[in-house]
Amino acid sequence: MAFKIKVNTEEGYILIRHYGETDLNENIQIGEKALQVAIKNRIKNVLVDVTGLTGGVSITDLFASTSHLAESTAEKPKTAIYGRQDQQRELEFIETVGLNRSMPIKSFMDRNAALAWLLMGNKRNSD
C-alpha cells in the first residue's frame, strides 16, 4: 500500500492519504509515523483520507490497529477520517473503537465536513 503524509502548518493539521490495499501491520506503521510527524510539528489535528483504499480490512484488524494506536501514546491528536459511502460501516467501527479508548475521532463521508469538524475551535483559524 502507498500513503502520503502532508503537513499543513498554515491551518494546523496533518493529512494522511491511503492508496491501494492495506493490512494490520501497514495500518499500525502509518499511524505511528503520523503520530511522530504530529508530535514533531506540534500539530494536534489529523485528517485521514481512505477514499483511495481498495479491497478490505477485516473487522479484527481494524479493531487491533485502532486499539494499538489509541493506546500507544498519551498524545491523542484530534482525528477526522473520511472515505467512500461503501466504507461507512468500517469507518464508524473505527470511530467507536477510538472513542472507547479516549481518542478524539470522528468518521465522515465528506472531506469538507471532516475538515470543518477537525478545525472547529482551532486557534490558528481564529487568529
At which residue positions do the language-model features occur?
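Amphipathic, Lys/Arg-enriched alpha-helical "gate/interface" segment within cytosolic domains
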Residues: 1-127
